[in-house]
Amino acid sequence: MTSKIFSPKISAVIESLRKLPTIGKKSSQRLALYLLDKSPETARAIANSLLDATANIKKCVYCQALTEDDVCNICSNTNRDDTKLCIIESMLDMIAIEEAGIYRGKYFVLNGRISPLDGVGPSELKLDILQRIIADRKIDEVILAISPTVEGETTAHFISQMIAKDIKISRIGFGVPFGGELEYLDQQTLLHAFNARTNI
C-alpha cells in the first residue's frame, strides 16, 4: 500500500526508518515526511553524522562500549575502581547506571544475551575477552547487572560458571521484575537494586 502512495525514494526512507527499534509504520511515515518536507537540513545533518559515526566508531578494546578511541572514557578513567566489574547487556544499561550515580567501577558490555534460538552464543558476546579482562586485572567483585529474563538468567549462569571461585560474584536484585529491562528502571529502583545485590 505504501508504494502506491509514495514514490520509490520516499518509500525507501520510510522502510529504512522502520528498521529502527520501536519505530512502526505510522511513526516511520511521520518521521520521513517531516524530514523530507519540513526539515531537509535536519535530514542532511542526521545523514552526515551517521556516516561520520559509522566510519569512525568502534568498540572499546576492554569493555566493548562504542567509542571513537581504542579505549573508552570510562575504561581510561584512572579515578574509577578497577577492582569492580559490572557486566551489562547494552550501553543503554551503562547510561542508566551512570545517570543514577550508583557505581564507580568499570564495565563490560555484552551487547546482547545468550539466545540459541537467535544464534547468539558465548562467542557472539565476546566472553573470551571478558575472561581475559578478569584474568588480567585484580578484580575482586563481578556484578551481574543483567535483565531477569530467560535469556538473561542463562547468560548470568554461564558467566558465573566461567569466573574463578576466588572472585566475588553478585547479582543486582531488589526492584528489578522478571522480564524487566535495566534501561527502563528509574534511578531510585536502580539504587535499591545495586544496594540489594546478592552473592552467587
Curated annotation (Swiss-Prot):
Domain of life where this protein originates: Bacteria
InterPro entries: DNA_Rcmb_RecR, Rcmb_RecR, Rcmb_RecR_Znf, TOPRIM_dom, TOPRIM_RecR
GO biological process, one term: DNA recombination
Pfam families: RecR_C, RecR_HhH, RecR_ZnF, Toprim_4
Ranges for domain Toprim: 83-177
GO molecular function, one term: DNA binding
C4-type ZnF: 60-75
Alphabetically ordered keywords of this record: DNA damage, DNA recombination, DNA repair, Metal-binding, Zinc, Zinc-finger
SMART domains xref list: TOPRIM (SM00493)
Family: Belongs to the RecR family.
NCBIfam families for the chain: recR
Task performed by this protein: May play a role in DNA repair. It seems to be involved in an RecBC-independent recombinational process of DNA repair. It may act with RecF and RecO.
Protein name: Recombination protein RecR
Organism of derivation: Francisella tularensis subsp. novicida (strain U112)
Gene: recR
